[in-house]
Every structure is written in C-alpha cells, then in structure tokens.
Amino acid sequence: MLKTTIIGASGYTGAELALMVEKHPELTLAGLYVSANSTDAGKCISQLHGKLAGVIEMPVLPLTDPLGVAQDSDVIFLATAHEVSHDLAPLFLQQGCQVFDLSGAFRVKGDDFYTQFYGFAHQHSEWLDKAAYGLAEWNEEAIKASQLVAVAGCYTTAAQLAIKPLLISQLVDTNQWPVINATSGVSGAGRKASMTNSFCEVSLQPYGIFNHRHQPEIVHHLGCDVIFTPHLGNFKRGILATITMKLQDGVTKEQVAHAFAQAYDRKPAVRLKGDVIPRIQDVEFTPFCDLGWRVQGQHIIVISAIDNLLKGASSQAMQCLNIHYGFSPLTALL
C-alpha cells in the first residue's frame, strides 16, 4: 500500500482526493494537512465536508514539519496555491516522494512565464524541466516516468481534449485561431467566501478577458494560438466549453469522427457523443469528459463538458497516479 498524503485537504479538491484515496485498493491515507495558519487546522475533515462523515474521520493537521511528513509518505498530492506548491514540491521530491501537483506551479516550462502570468519568479527550473504535464490522455509515457506530475488546469483540460485530436490529425486551419468560450461553476474559485461568488451576487458573466492564465497554458501545450474567454456560471460545479474552429479545405465529417475515435480509443475517461450535445448534468460528480461536435461547411463546433473539481482537478490527478503506477486508469474513480 502506498502511503498517501494530501496537502491542502480542506478545500474542495482536497476533499475529493481524500475520498478517492480512501476508495483506492492500493493506497492508504497517511495524513491530511493544511497551512499552519489555516483556520481549518485541527478540525476533522468530516466537519468541513459533511459528505465524508462516517467515511473519513481524520483531523486536518497544520503542516509544521514537512520533512517529517515526507518521511512518512510515498505519495504527495498538493492541492495548494501556486506559490505554496512551488515551495513545497521540491522539498518532497528531494525526500523521494512521488508528487502530483494540482496547482499551476510546474505546468509550463520557462521561468519568465511565471513572472508574467502568476506574479512570482520561478526558483526551481530543474524541476520545471523534469515535470510531466498531467493531461492524462495525451501524456501517458511522461506521466509514467516522472517523479513530478503537474496536473493540467480545469479549463485547459476541457479545451485541449476537444482540440488536440483535430490538431494532431492536421484537420484544423490554424490561420483562424480556435475560439474557446467556457463556463465554469462557482466551485472553480475555491471554498473561500467572496462577494462575487455569494449566492445573491453570482451571475453569468465573462472574466479574465485576454489575460486569464489558462490561455497561455492552452497555447503552450497545443502549439497554436487560441482566443479563450472564461465565464463564471451561477451553478456549483462543472465546465462547459464551446469551441469553434475552421477546418482545412475538403475535411469531411467522417474524417472528424475518425480523428476523435482514433485519439480516444481505450481512453475510458473520454466519452464521445458525436452529434449529441454534452451537458454538465451528465458529467458532474464523474471523472469523464464528454465530447460532442457538429460540422457545417468548413467550420466545426466542439462541445466539451467536465466536472471542474474531478476531471478538471482531483480525478485527473488520481488518473495520473494510476497511470504512473500501472493501475487501471479509473481505479477509485467510479
């Protein structure tokens, strides 16, 4: 059994991970931790997340001795802020732990990227270079080999799973940039209360126009420019992305369908719906990405639906763990 520790366990993604670890036949939950100054420190996780009552009755402890935690852990999940993951990941890695980081701290190679888009100077370029990008369906070999897996972002997962098959098959005319309009539930902003996310204030609206940090992450890993506009939806969880692309001259519906089928053959976390339009309702509380599409003339619209807390975060992290250790990819996820 792999001794597994979750740092940042009080948040939504941390709680989802705790439940997955508890269900996993090859993992044992070694500890749940939050930052030393967190108001959640010392509370039972079932007190913070009622759905875990009777399932996990373990205290969420303040992280005051990271080296001690590392010595008692085989696997570390970091469900922490970007800067916190940046500082903690190298410490755990140096102690021999396998690390799955759900933040953006190691997703994009290039130190100046973090200064520009995350507001801090990256100090660990050696680990940045070694990190595997955790887009599970598209990076299995690197995930198997790397001690550090930087789990892909939520919007970036929904977008890339929809675009990559067509891009790899050279069916897209990239002279016209793919246009991604994606709407996320309020849980994407985390558990901390804010006026914008409060019940009476939350409203469907775009945000981060031209400057959302997932845009350069998408561009970096796709290898082509995109226009990305995220939206805040007045619902709890899920992402629905609607992506418009121009196809190369002469591309047929059959070629499009073949590209998706070829890309996701034996990839059980991606469900191809064809001309059936995906819905958040069908993917929330699941580890799946549903993809549907329609072709008209030279244009295609692809719809991608995921649960932002699961396929967009925790279940993808666990999927990466399963890939790394050679377990069935959806172990503990269904």
UniProtKB/Swiss-Prot annotation:
Pathway involvement of the protein, from the record: Amino-acid biosynthesis; L-arginine biosynthesis; N(2)-acetyl-L-ornithine from L-glutamate: step 3/4
GO terms for biological process, alphabetical: L-arginine biosynthetic process
Annotated active site: C154
Subcellular location: Cytoplasm
Matching SMART domains: Semialdhyde_dh
First-level EC class: oxidoreductase
Enzyme Commission number, as recorded: 1.2.1.38
Gene Ontology, cellular component aspect: cytoplasm
Main location per the UniProt record: cytoplasm
Function according to Swiss-Prot or TrEMBL: Catalyzes the NADPH-dependent reduction of N-acetyl-5-glutamyl phosphate to yield N-acetyl-L-glutamate 5-semialdehyde.
Name of the protein this chain belongs to: N-acetyl-gamma-glutamyl-phosphate reductase
Originating organism: Vibrio vulnificus (strain CMCP6)
